[in-house]
């Protein structure tokens, strides 16, 4: 059950990160504080997406709390690296995102996935 909570946490955190990235690119910069505050108070689509992203992170923390009670810490923290993979893929696939493909990033994703497989695949016990 800890793995399920961990996967929920990773997926929710990834969606939250994408939401915050979208909101940050569409809201006025915080260097123009009054424009930024006015955009938040208008509670348009960008402000709502910002709020959903923040609430997503809060929900992700709850799932992470449940994960840490059910899953070994060494496995739980390795699971977090999946968020990098999900956000990278989503940034290239989702419309309006400007993620770019590179062999260097693909190599990084391959390393992350290889590490996760080493940690999570069952091992066979050898008898001596």
Curated annotation (Swiss-Prot):
Keywords: Cell inner membrane, Cell membrane, Lipid A biosynthesis, Lipid biosynthesis, Lipid metabolism, Lipopolysaccharide biosynthesis, Membrane, Transmembrane, Transmembrane helix, Transport. Pathway: Bacterial outer membrane biogenesis; lipopolysaccharide biosynthesis. The keyword Lipid biosynthesis applies. It is found in: Cell inner membrane. Residues 24-35, 97-100 are periplasmic. Residues 1-2, 57-75, 122-128 are cytoplasmic. It is a multi-pass membrane protein. This is Probable 4-amino-4-deoxy-L-arabinose-phosphoundecaprenol flippase subunit ArnF. The lineage of its organism: Bacteria, Pseudomonadati, Pseudomonadota, Gammaproteobacteria, Enterobacterales. The gene is arnF.
